[in-house]
UniProtKB/Swiss-Prot annotation:
Compositional bias per record (Basic and acidic residues), positions renumbered to this chain: 286-298
InterPro entries assigned to the protein according to its UniProt record, in alphabetical order: Znf_C2HC_C3H (IPR049899), ZNF_C2HC_dom_1C (IPR026104)
PROSITE patterns: ZF_C2HC_C3H
Superkingdom of this protein's organism: Eukaryota
Bias kind Polar residues: ranges: 50-61, 301-312
Cofactor or coenzyme needed: Zn(2+)
Residues where Zn(2+) 2 binds: C493, C496, H508, C512
Annotated protein name in UniProt: Zinc finger C2HC domain-containing protein 1C
Keywords of the record: Coiled coil, Metal-binding, Repeat, Zinc, Zinc-finger
Amino acid sequence: MAGLQLAPHLPVGVMFPHNKTEAPGLHSAKHDPYEQSDSSQRPSMGHLRNSFQSKLWSNTEMEQEDEVSTRPKRNVCTKARRHSCPHSAGIRQQGSGNNAQGQGKGLFYLSSPTPRYPKANDQDFIPFRRKRVGVDRAYPLKPMVHRKSHSTSDAGADGDQNGYPRLPDSSEFSDNSFGLRSWVNSSLLASVQAEKVVAELHRTEWTQIQRLEAAGESLQKEIRRKEILLQEKLKKTEEGLRRMQKEKKQAIFQEDRELQRMVLPRRRVRDGDHDTPHKPCLSPEFRSEVFSRNRGEDQTCDQAQENPSPRQLSDYELQKLKRERLMASNSKIRDQDAGPSADAFFQPAEELGSTLQESSRSGTPGSSGSSSSTEEPELAKCSHCGRSFLSLRLQRHSTVCGKMQGSKRKVFDSSRARAKGTELEQYLNWRGPATAKAETPPPPRKSTWRQKHESFIRTLRHARQVQQVIARGGNPSDLPSILPADNPDYVQCPHCSRHFAPKVAERHIPKCKTIKNRPPPPRRHDS
């Protein structure tokens, strides 16, 4: 009796069913002994049913408020309650079995208009038996059952033995709902944290992508900037090269023009020094034509550089003739004594003027058709040097070239020039023939390096043998004498029959001669 506790007093003697549809099937008129009781107790049963329904509805409203807040929470709560409250399948089987055996246990279930929870076990309901008239309606003591140990099979056994299944307590609903709320909150927090982590990962990836794109754009800008700089440098170098080429062409053209201007006045001065027949070297027509051409050179400089014309060729021939004439005049001044007469060097003015006029007319713009048909001047080779010259210039060149080929230049001796006017000059004049003989190179000698090498090896071997004999304590004179070296370069002295090197022999032979030819010393007479 210590483990028992009093059950709450109910004013009604009949237990209400959970579902009205199941109540007729659970008990029949045959097995229920209290079926013929009076109908005065029915209003009390309705009152009990309404009070219990209101209690259940208060619990369900509290849970509905939580379900409205989060939709997934409702599904989780329903699943948890289904696991916590066993189904009513075992109850139905047990009720039908009890009715078949005739035990008279009337199990009724509370019916609700919209049932939201699964049917409870037999232990969650209180069976009620109608009491007879005049008997106390106090309920017997209800046995204590642990919440975690009850199951469907235990509930069926307890229902058969005691017949007092307990009602569902409101604390169980509150405890289950609190655990479910905490579990749902933890799951929601975990999902929210996972979403935050995923969002942060996406954010970091996006920032990295943006940084890479920015770096790529900066690299492209840098590459474009460097390309622009290289193009500018290339343009500058091209412009510099073009400017240098243009300046070079202009410098060459200016040099040619200055040469023409220098040659003409010299020619006039040189013609003035000669006799009157040679004075008119150039005709007045040719002079006027040359001066007019020099004036128009500045205007036609660019056109001549881009489009070479036959006139340039004629100018080049004219410049070549003038250079040769200038060189010939310089050589004539050097060789005034041995040179031929002026009539042999210079042709008459009429012939030279006619040749120059023909060459200049071939280069005029009006005679473009005739310049193509003009014949090239004949060239002849020199018999001395083999070079080719114009037939007009070949005679003069041959005379000068023959003189240069036949003459031999004297080698300048700076030592004699420094010694001139001093006492050293007499010594050099006295020593002149000997030095001339010494200056003649000696004939080449045949190489005898192999014979020298073999003689050197023989000498080393003989020296090694002598060292070995001395180490043993013997006499080195017992060894055979070494053969003399056959060196053809050495010179034998005629007085002592020894061989010496050439330079050493030159010093030794006179001394040995005096020593050998010296008379013997006088004998000493002993007293």
